[in-house]
């Protein structure tokens, strides 16, 4: 996790992102970049009643909290993001509890609850070239959930 003493310019954060991921930085159409020198940056867009988080670089917990506050202020029902890490350590990192696991053709879907009892769903998105599975993450902002298509 980044600390507040690691201030960087936006270009320095982009360079850090590119070195860490091996990906070239780009911001998709419709996404807005939020940046703070000592926190990094996040790319966020609204899609209907969901706030989508595309890239986060820097203090991930800060940007998650920022996105949750922003989504709530905008009247969104859920946060949507992508998990490129192993799902179970990712779930533990956020303090979520797995309530149910589904296995379909060797791909797992994880139904979780956060510390406030709200639903979180990790669903397989695609398989990377190295064989790792990338997941869609839907975190509902109220107890219960709405259906998002």
Which sequence ranges carry the predicted segments?
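Acyl-donor binding region in acyl/amide transferases
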Residues: 47-106
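A conserved beta-strand-loop-helix scaffold within acyl/acetyltransferase catalytic domains
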Residues: 18-49, 124
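Conserved catalytic-core motifs of GNAT/GCN5-like acyltransferases
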Residues: 97-114, 119-129
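Secondary-structure transition/turn motif
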Residues: 55-60, 113-117, 138-145
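A cross-taxonomic marker for long C-terminal extensions/tails that follow the last structured domain
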Residues: 121-144, 148
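Short glycine-aromatic motifs
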Residues: 2-4, 30-31, 93-98, 120-122
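Short, ordered beta-strand-loop transition motifs
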Residues: 27-28, 45-52, 102-106, 126-133
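Short amphipathic alpha-helix that is part of the acyltransferase structural core
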Residues: 1-23, 132, 137, 148
């Amino acid at each position: 996790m980044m600390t507040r003493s690691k201030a960087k310019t936006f270009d320095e954060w982009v360079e850090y992102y590119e070195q860490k991921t091996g990906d070239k930085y780009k911001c998709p159409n419709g996404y807005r970049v939020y940046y703070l020198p000592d926190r990094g940056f996040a790319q966020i867009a609204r899609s209907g009643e969901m706030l989508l988080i595309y890239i986060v670089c820097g203090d991930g917990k800060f940007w998650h909290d920022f996105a949750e506050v922003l989504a709530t202020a905008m009247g969104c029902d859920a946060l949507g993001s992508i998990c490129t890490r192993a799902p179970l350590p990712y779930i533990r990192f956020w303090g979520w509890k797995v309530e149910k696991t589904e296995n379909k053709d060797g791909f797992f879907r994880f139904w979780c609850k956060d510390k406030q009892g709200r639903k979180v769903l990790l669903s397989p998105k695609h398989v990377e070239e190295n064989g790792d599975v990338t997941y869609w993450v839907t975190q509902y902002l109220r107890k219960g959930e709405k259906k998002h298509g």
